[in-house]
Regions:
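Amphipathic alpha-helical interface elements
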Residues: 1-114
Length: 114
C-alpha cells in the first residue's frame, strides 16, 4: 500500500512543480512554514489538499477531472498515509484501499507520465 501512496505523492509533486510557481506553493502552507518551501518536494500530503482546493490553482492544472472528487480523495489518502506512518495495526479497510487506488487512477489519467 505504501508503494501506491508513494506513487500518488510523486505524481502530485511532479504536477505541482510543472504547473505552479513558488508563490502558489507557499500559499498552500501556513505562514510559519512558508520560508521552508522551495519547491513541491517540501510540501506535505496535507498541503496538497489546500493547494488543489483553490479554484485558480486548480484551473492552472488543466485537469479535466472533478475538483471536489480529487480534493476529497487527496484528503482521504492523506489520512490513510498518516495511519500507516504511525504504525496502525488494523488491516486497511476496503474504503481506505479504494481511496488510494481511486486517487491513483485519477492521477494516472491526469498526468500519464510515471
Amino acid at each position: 500500500m505504501s508503494v501506491l501512496i508513494e506513487e500518488a505523492e510523486n505524481r502530485l509533486r511532479r504536477a505541482a512543480d510543472e504547473h505552479f510557481d513558488l508563490q502558489d506553493l507557499k500559499d498552500s502552507v501556513a505562514n510559519h512554514q512558508k520560508s521552508r518551501i522551495k519547491d513541491a518536494y517540501h510540501l506535505t500530503f496535507g498541503n496538497y489538499v489546500y493547494l488543489l482546493r483553490d479554484a485558480d490553482r486548480w484551473h492552472k492544472l488543466g485537469w479535466r477531472l472533478d475538483q471536489d472528487q480529487v480534493v476529497d480523495l487527496v484528503e482521504r489518502v492523506k489520512n490513510v498515509r498518516n495511519d500507516l506512518m504511525h504504525f496502525a495495526t488494523d488491516p486497511l479497510s476496503e474504503d481506505k484501499f479504494a481511496a488510494v487506488t481511486g486517487l491513483l487512477q485519477l492521477l494516472r489519467t491526469a498526468e500519464p507520465n510515471p
